[in-house]
């Protein structure tokens, strides 16, 4: 948000109490502020439901452990605080729910964090759900790192500058998002979401290979489609598979299930398998 512009309504649980607004949580010497020792997760409340909140609360703890932080908050405590925080907003408000851990101090190795300095907060803020109008994609020149080079098995803040530069480059060429490949040239995901294609009534999605986070919403969509009798194949995809697909759609926590309406110069319409995935997810969320 631009300097001087108000933040949306925000409540954060930090240091044992709820605080309103965009409160400061780090100092200039904080390890996370300059060496990126932070993790987060993102969940959603919309239309009075909070799907898979338990899984998001568990995942932030797993991410913390991966980043050598101490996950000092139980998943049950995260969930209880989340439900308490939701009560501070209008009942029909769409919210983004973001639990976080970060290191306050360096350890004896200086660059490495001190696990005993782990801090945490839970922030909830108003973030309207996006209309299912779809968006355009292209191929990014940037690549996803592997587990040997970055902590891609955690939802770590340090991963997102790579996503950001991919988005900026694609946006400069007139696209809303982009497909990002792994170092072998296979499509991994979009810059901000997991990816699905459909061809001849079969859904395909990149198989988790250690270069992208196997999203909670992704896993939920796969399960729902399979339970409904739809064939979903986790496999290796090249960009040509996207170019020749009957449908392309995305899954992610922020926008849930969304259609892709253009790949490069080729226009696409929201298709039956995208609509099925979205309908199934909404039914699951409201069950």
What does each model-identified segment do?
Residues 1-84, 102, 108-287:
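Helix-start/capping segments and mature chain N-termini
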């Amino acid at each position: 948000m631009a300097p001087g512009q108000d933040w949306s309504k925000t409540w954060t649980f930090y240091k044992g109490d709820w605080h309103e607004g965009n409160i400061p949580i780090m100092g200039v010497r904080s390890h996370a502020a300059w060496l990126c020792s932070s993790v987060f997760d993102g969940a959603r409340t919309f239309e009075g439901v909070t799907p898979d909140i338990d899984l998001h609360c568990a995942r932030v703890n797993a991410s913390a452990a991966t980043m050598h932080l101490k996950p000092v908050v139980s998943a049950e405590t995260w969930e209880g605080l989340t439900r308490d925080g939701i009560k501070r907003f209008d009942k029909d408000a769409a919210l983004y729910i973001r639990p976080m851990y970060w290191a306050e101090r360096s350890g004896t190795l200086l660059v490495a964090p001190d696990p005993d300095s782990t801090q945490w907060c839970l922030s909830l803020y108003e973030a309207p759900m996006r209309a299912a109008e779809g968006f355009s994609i292209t191929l990014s020149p940037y690549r996803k790192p592997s587990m040997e080079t970055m902590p891609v098995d955690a939802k770590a803040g340090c991963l997102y500058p790579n996503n950001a530069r991919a988005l900026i480059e694609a946006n400069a060429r007139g696209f809303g998002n982009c497909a990002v490949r792994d170092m072998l040239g296979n499509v991994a995901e979009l810059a901000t979401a997991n990816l699905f294609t459909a061809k001849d009534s079969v859904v395909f999605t990149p198989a988790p290979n250690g270069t992208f986070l196997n999203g909670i919403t992704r896993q939920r969509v796969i399960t729902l489609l399979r339970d409904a009798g739809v064939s979903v194949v986790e496999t290796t995809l090249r960009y040509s598979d996207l170019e020749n697909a009957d449908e392309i759609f995305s899954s992610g926590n922020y926008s849930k299930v969304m259609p892709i309406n253009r790949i490069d110069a080729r226009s696409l319409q929201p298709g039956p398998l995208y609509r099925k995935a979205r309908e199934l997810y909404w039914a699951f969320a409201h069950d």
